[in-house]
Amino acid sequence: GLLENTYNLRLSNASEQTLYLQADVSGFDHIELTGLPKTLEIPAGDIVNIPVQVATYPEYATKGSHPIEFQFRYHTEENQEWRSINENSNFIGE
């Protein structure tokens, strides 16, 4: 089976328009992010807390802490150009 870690993403939209956001994760082979829709809508001025899971096969996440990176792409209705921001975290292997 897969090894999973759970993360609570706190996403804030400080703009005056709805934000459209997509997320992914990287750090090692065969890692995937689950628990989010393909595109998430965050209303203007809103903050959402979303639990997500990051999963991989145990052979890729040996015992200990492994650096991973969440990648977020977003745009607003007015500005259709995708922008991005990355956040570092850790995946705990067994």
Which role does the model predict for each range below?
Residues 2-7, 48-49, 63-68:
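Short, solvent-exposed loop/turn segments enriched in Ser/Thr/Gly
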Residues 27-37, 77-81:
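Short aromatic-acidic-glycine turn motif
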Residues 56-94:
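Terminal connector regions
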